[in-house]
């Protein structure tokens, strides 16, 4: 056939449809000659149309297939199908330059005008075949992975699994294919949540993971961490999901071991019981094991706890680990015996490692508990029992129907040592007094330090003559002066004695305290029995004390707020929060009455804690109303300062309500400045470090020296109302106030005069440069809800 005839034939039969086809199109006649060769075919083979048309098709067949090709064509012409399978056949096409590319092709047999033609449609499949080869290699690689892997179709059916999956779960691909993992691996009797979470993971459209308890083909239950990774095509259509598995059974056991032990620690069981809990949990993880714990005391191992199993284990292998404190010092020994082959060595080592850390925590917890117990029950300076210990001791005696005699001992004149030599030497003086007490202490007597310079002796000798003899012996303890830094300091004791059959602890301590106060008010250096007159007063206090306890627990106390004004500008300096109590039975009870009572019955710290929290809450509420209060001051008892929880209580309240330290001022009395307790001053310094101001209330009523004022981190001093009342009539008082304001200015302290009621008092105080004024002249103490109205209608005051 000539070239023009071929062109005409192609043009008439195939050209309109195939010339622009993106697939290579090749048409051959009954003589196997190429009649049509479109541009796409030119691109695939690298031949020009003119080179191919009219030539035998063999020139387009790869050399290695040419020998068999004529027979294939002949066979097909004689009875082959009209259409060979679509585009599903791959063939390596050999180009003009000898290079080869992968293609997909379909061959169609066409009969026309009694002649048989063949049309081949071919497209480049290089990328597909490369991907197919990559997939094949990937499948081989995945099959050799140590981690189990399955491949899912978009309907979450398993289409592929590797050998590691088969080894872990027991299912080969023929058994797993077409199954959904939540059906194949779920434990029927396990809570539904397990399967629901597995289903949720399977239907994730992004990477995710979770942990499940799954079932193997053999019925074994194993903890698994499963991860899912969706695979998308270029059009963001989901093609497959790859799911990987990790056996975390041992990891879960170790986490459970750690969690169980930590949970037990939170309940603070006794030390030996905690050890048994650790042993039992180790035993539950390690099959056929025996566990022992030893604590080191002075370097020697002391048995702490053991598991319940007997120590005799067949073919036992032993593991031993040193339990160490945080600083690395040895604190104990952990011993584990397991049956040979019961567990892998690596797993036992992991269990031993985490267990020794848990045991170390338990030992530290016990050490901390003992330390806290020591702090709670004993005075850190003297080593004597403290107030808490005393309360427990007296309660125990009363419960046993024993009537003790209580001697409340106040050491007089310690202040002389402080003023002369300082606090450190005063500590030494008190320790010397304690040592002398101990030398005289009898086996059945109990001695404790309840605060500062006050001690309590409890004796079971209740004969009157014996009581007075003991009191005299106590006084004789300090008959000789205490030698401090080669200087003699004469000290005396004021002793209050209480004894009454069937009375409780509060009664005994209150009455002894009243008796001691009576001695001190009369010059000290003596002892005093509690009198009937005192008894009536105590009864009244006990009734009122019960009411006060109820008021505190029922939140019946209230705070009122008295403004403080700058004397020169009339602007607000701050507000003082004052506690008030109105009892349904006793009516209005003044602070001068219920505050000392709260101190006696041990409720003063609860009041102080409430005052701090309520003041901070109210300050935050005003702030939310855009009411600016520069500072709020609160009064705290000296006893509250003896609590090591005070700084934390203040910090917690400030943090809870978002209060800055400079917005809060804590007031202490001048008499508390004279207290000899270094712990108190440490707590004061902590408060100042938090930014909290420190005000000395009732300044001038005590006997504190300037050295004390300088040594404390004071920011403010308050002139007592008793001086303000007399400043207009007594020149000496006025001179004292002038001196106080001058001292305040020199030390950069704010001086506040409280109790100012008249214009004359105000003018006089402003004249001597008292910076801040507080009192009824400006405002009475107001409920919180009245403060905003007062500020908007009065401030700034016209001075």
Curated annotation (Swiss-Prot):
Its cofactor is heme; Mg(2+). Its EC number is 3.1.4.52. The heme distal ligand is coordinated by Met-87 in the active Fe(2+) (ferrous) form, by O(2) in the O(2)-bound form and by H(2)O in the inactive Fe(3+) (ferric) form. GO terms for molecular function: cyclic-guanylate-specific phosphodiesterase activity; heme binding; magnesium ion binding; oxygen sensor activity; protein homodimerization activity. Induction: Expressed in the late exponential growth phase and at higher levels in the stationary phase. A member of the dosCP operon. Expression is RpoS dependent and is higher at 28 degrees Celsius than at 37 degrees Celsius. Residues 10-81, 134-207 form the PAS domain. Gene3D superfamilies: 3.30.70.270, EAL domain, PAS domain. Residues 402-532 form the GGDEF domain. GO terms for cellular component: plasma membrane. It catalyses: 3',3'-c-di-GMP + H2O = 5'-phosphoguanylyl(3'->5')guanosine + H(+). Heme-based oxygen sensor protein displaying phosphodiesterase (PDE) activity toward c-di-GMP in response to oxygen availability. Involved in the modulation of intracellular c-di-GMP levels, in association with DosC which catalyzes the biosynthesis of c-di-GMP (diguanylate cyclase activity). Cyclic-di-GMP is a second messenger which controls cell surface-associated traits in bacteria. Has very poor PDE activity on cAMP but is not active with cGMP, bis(p-nitrophenyl) phosphate or p-nitrophenyl phosphate. Binds O(2) with a dissociation constant of about 74 uM. This is Oxygen sensor protein DosP. The gene is dosP.
């Amino acid at each position: 056939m000539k070239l023009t005839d071929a062109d005409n034939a192609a043009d008439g039969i195939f050209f309109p449809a195939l010339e622009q086809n993106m697939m290579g199109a090749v048409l051959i006649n009954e003589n196997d000659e190429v009649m049509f060769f479109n541009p796409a075919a030119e691109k695939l083979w690298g031949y020009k149309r003119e080179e191919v048309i009219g030539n035998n098709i063999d020139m387009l067949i790869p050399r290695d297939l040419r020998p068999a090709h004529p027979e294939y064509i002949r066979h097909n012409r004689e009875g082959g199908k009209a259409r060979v399978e679509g585009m599903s056949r791959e063939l390596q096409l050999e180009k003009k330059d000898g290079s080869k590319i992968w293609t997909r092709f379909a061959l169609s047999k066409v009969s026309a005008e009694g002649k048989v033609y063949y049309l081949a449609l071919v497209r480049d499949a290089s990328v597909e075949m490369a991907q197919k080869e990559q997939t094949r290699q990937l499948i081989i690689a995945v099959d050799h992975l140590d981690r189990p892997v399955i491949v899912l179709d978009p309907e979450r059916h398993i289409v592929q699994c590797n050998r590691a999956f088969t080894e872990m779960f027991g299912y080969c691909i023929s058994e797993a294919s077409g199954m959904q993992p939540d059906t194949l691996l779920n434990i029927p009797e396990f809570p539904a949540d397990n399967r629901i979470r597995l289903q949720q993971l399977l239907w994730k459209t992004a990477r995710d993971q979770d942990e499940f308890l799954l079932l193997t083909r053999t019925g074994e239950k194993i903890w698994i961490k499963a991860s899912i990774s969706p695979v998308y095509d270029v059009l963001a259509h989901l093609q497959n999901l790859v799911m990987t598995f990790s056996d975390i059974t041992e990891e879960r056991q170790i986490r459970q071991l750690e969690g169980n032990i930590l949970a037990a620690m939170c309940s603070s069981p006794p030390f030996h019981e905690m050890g048994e809990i650790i042993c039992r949990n180790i035993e539950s993880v390690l099959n056929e094991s025996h566990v022992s714990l030893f604590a080191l005391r002075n370097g020697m191992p002391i048995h702490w706890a053991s598991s319940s199993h007997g120590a005799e284990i067949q073919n036992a292998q032993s593991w031993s680990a040193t339990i160490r404190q945080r600083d690395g010092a040895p604190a104990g020994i952990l011993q584990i015996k397991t049956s040979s082959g019961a567990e892998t060595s690596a797993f036992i080592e992991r269990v031993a490692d985490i267990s020794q850390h848990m045991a170390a925590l338990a030992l530290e917890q016990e050490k901390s508990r003992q330390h806290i117990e020591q702090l709670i029950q004993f005075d850190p300076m003297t080593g004597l029992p403290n107030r808490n210990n005393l309360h427990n001791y007296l309660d125990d005696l009363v419960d046993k129907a024993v009537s003790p005699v209580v001697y409340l001992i106040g050491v007089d004149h310690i202040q002389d040592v402080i003023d002369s030599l300082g606090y450190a030497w005063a500590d030494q003086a008190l320790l010397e007094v304690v040592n002398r007490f101990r030398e005289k202490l009898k086996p059945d007597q109990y001695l404790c330090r309840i605060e500062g310079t006050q001690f309590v002796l409890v004796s079971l000798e209740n004969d009157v003559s014996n009581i007075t003899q003991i009191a005299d012996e106590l006084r004789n303890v300090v008959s000789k002066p205490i030698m401090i830094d080669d200087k003699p300091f004469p000290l005396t004791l004021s002793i209050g004695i209480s004894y009454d059959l069937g009375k409780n602890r509060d009664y005994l301590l209150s009455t002894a305290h009243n008796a001691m106060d009576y001695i001190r008010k009369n010059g000290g250096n003596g002892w005093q029995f509690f009198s009937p007159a005192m008894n009536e007063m105590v009864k009244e206090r006990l009734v009122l004390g019960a009411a006060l306890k109820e008021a505190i627990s029922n939140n019946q106390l209230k705070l009122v707020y008295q403004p403080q004004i700058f004397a020169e500008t009339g602007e607000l300096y701050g507000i003082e929060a004052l506690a008030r109590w109105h009892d349904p039975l006793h009516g209005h009870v003044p602070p001068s009455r219920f505050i000392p009572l709260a101190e006696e019955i041990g409720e003063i710290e609860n009041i102080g804690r409430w005052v701090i929290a309520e003041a901070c809450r109210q300050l935050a509420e005003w702030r939310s109303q855009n009411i600016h209060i520069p500072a709020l001051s609160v009064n705290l008892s000296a006893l509250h300062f003896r609590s090591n929880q005070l700084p934390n209580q203040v910090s917690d309240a400030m943090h809870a309500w978002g209060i800055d330290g400079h917005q809060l001022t804590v007031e202490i009395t001048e008499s508390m400045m004279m207290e000899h307790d270094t712990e108190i001053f440490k707590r004061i310094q902590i408060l100042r470090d938090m930014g909290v101001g420190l005000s000395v209330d009732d300044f001038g009523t005590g006997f504190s020296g300037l050295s004390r004022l300088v040594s404390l981190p004071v920011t403010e001093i308050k002139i007592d109302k008793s001086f303000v009342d007399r400043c207009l009539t007594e020149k000496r008082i006025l001179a004292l106030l002038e001196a106080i304001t001058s001292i305040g200015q020199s030390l950069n302290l704010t001086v506040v005069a409280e109790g100012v009621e008249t214009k004359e008092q105000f003018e006089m105080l402003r004249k001597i440069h008292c910076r801040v004024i507080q009192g009824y002249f400006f405002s009475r103490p107001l409920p919180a809800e009245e403060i905003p109205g007062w500020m908007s209608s009065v401030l700034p005051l016209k001075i």
